[in-house]
Amino acid sequence: MKIILTHEVSGLGAAGDVVDVKDGYARNYLIPRNFAIRWTKGGEKDVEQIRRARKIHEIQTIEQANEIKARLEGVKVRLAVRSGDAGRLFGSVTPADVASAIKASGGPEVDKRRIELGSPIKTLGAHETSVRLHPEVAAKVNIEVVAA
């Protein structure tokens, strides 16, 4: 089935791409979660609109990505969360928490979908995450998780 992606789907494509996937994957996963719409001839107009919107929000060049990478790696990120006596957190740190902590620390605004946590952060201390700014550029961000 041909579909038009409305959001970036890892391993499949970016918003505005027209891709061919299995019918069940499209009907049961992508379309109900609004990650994609069915492809139609009239949908080609939607593709252009989605691509224009993506272009505005996308980091345009590798130079821009490297500039943001330098700013990100220079920021000291501290995240205060509730924790128990043994240093274990109540819950875990999510990419959305990391994105808001980066912005609060004076860093650039980062989309939470670009933050890659190796595994959920569930303990206090220093942790390293990466931020995929461009297909060829990733920034390493050190996060210090402290008790609130």
From Swiss-Prot:
The organism's place on the tree of life at top rank: Bacteria
Keyword tags: Ribonucleoprotein, Ribosomal protein, RNA-binding, rRNA-binding
Gene3D superfamilies from the UniProt entry: Ribosomal protein L9, C-terminal domain, Ribosomal protein L9, N-terminal domain
UniProt xrefs under InterPro entries: Ribosomal_bL9 (IPR000244), Ribosomal_bL9/RNase_H1_N (IPR009027), Ribosomal_bL9_bac/chp (IPR020594), Ribosomal_bL9_C (IPR020069), Ribosomal_bL9_C_sf (IPR036791), Ribosomal_bL9_N (IPR020070), Ribosomal_bL9_N_sf (IPR036935)
Keyword field contains rRNA-binding: yes
GO BP: translation
Entries under SUPFAM superfamilies matching the protein: L9 N-domain-like (SSF55658), Ribosomal protein L9 C-domain (SSF55653)
Membrane spanning residue stretches: none
Keyword hit for Zinc-finger: no
GO cellular component labels: ribonucleoprotein complex; ribosome
Molecular function via GO: rRNA binding; structural constituent of ribosome
Annotated family: Belongs to the bacterial ribosomal protein bL9 family.
Chain's role: Binds to the 23S rRNA.
Protein name: Large ribosomal subunit protein bL9
Gene source species: Streptomyces avermitilis (strain ATCC 31267 / DSM 46492 / JCM 5070 / NBRC 14893 / NCIMB 12804 / NRRL 8165 / MA-4680)
